[in-house]
């Protein structure tokens, strides 16, 4: 379980790296393609779309498959961004990479929380934030070391390396018990939970998931959104949204 959570958290390195690597590459991309502000805008547009799609995708195909899609997307789109021959293709790849980032923002914390034992869940969830910061630092360091060479393609393409390593590691992981329970596959959920929790906590953990799923709000998307901002949690949610800006 710890291996699974650490593997997922490692995707934060790629996410953090993408945040900072464009700072070094920006002036050289502008020189070659004549674009500047659109570079970051394209990524942000993709991130918004990815963040919206992340939850439905994880529920539809599973947490593990979603993680594989994210890691593969990071790898492929980072490489295609680095080798783009034109501004149009470059921006298209930035949008697709942004979608991948948006997906990861939604899916990775869920995958970690559902794959970790209750006693270690908080610490392992924090690991994702730590790896994001590590990625940001690496982005600046790599950009600084390659800056004199004008090799912006290398600066952007290096992001594929950690993503590919995580992709290989994810193959060894399992689906989460919560997703199996969501799909009504309780026997598989029990087997998955037995790999995470000690024997005496397996059934209580499954009962907790069962109760959580039974209390999920039903109805339309707009109805669920209204419920999110109803009652005592509205102020906290508004604060979190404003903090993001």
Located regions from the model:
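Transmembrane-helix signature of 12-pass secondary carriers
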Residues: 1-245
